[in-house]
């Protein structure tokens, strides 16, 4: 189960809800991110267009994205809207929901291993990561790449550290992206092949220093394809620019003709 630091949501919050009961005047839903807290979805907030049957839009058991429109702390009631959620809000929420589910799954497994409750997992791990880094999932991704200091710096108790590090690698994979360029390198010098190797070797050194993977291969001389692979698209763009600038400079020194092939 997913737990939230706050006991109830705030107005305007976008949430995942599960439809529980449908009536002629609306539907009762549970809020998945608030320990299945109950909320009411009025008929008037289900669709912006006229519908004859409420079940044409929602069905029991289905998960929907809703916006909180009223919170009465005194009465303990919450009203939500389906129609006030934009397509962009829905898309972003569903993406976030997938991440929340991964965090929940990891905490469920690890808490069982160390004889803790899942709620303790949220309190001692997820909430601390949220306080320190803003997002628990992103912090776990960071821990995969940078190590357990990410967890320790957030104040996660030692008992969680090792089993968490063992488990997150099984559930969280960094999305790797690739940036490619095609260049031509020509030399009429008898030592031309060595000169071209020197030029391309400098490109490899730049990529390795930036901690990104690089592959260079011929696609039919004098054309060469340069692929760099990493997890940060902005960094890849910066590294590729540096590589091309460096190739241009060394090619000039070695009297190698260099061009970038426009794709």
UniProtKB/Swiss-Prot annotation:
SUPFAM superfamilies: eIF-2-alpha, C-terminal domain, eIF2alpha middle domain-like, Nucleic acid-binding proteins. Residues 12-83 form the S1 motif domain. SMART domains: S1 (SM00316). Pfam families: EIF_2_alpha, S1. One of its GO terms (molecular function) is ribosome binding. Keywords: Initiation factor, Protein biosynthesis, RNA-binding. Heterotrimer composed of an alpha, a beta and a gamma chain. Belongs to the eIF-2-alpha family. NCBIfam families: PRK03987.1-1. eIF-2 functions in the early steps of protein synthesis by forming a ternary complex with GTP and initiator tRNA. This is Translation initiation factor 2 subunit alpha. The lineage of its organism: Archaea, Thermoproteota, Thermoprotei, Sulfolobales, Sulfolobaceae.
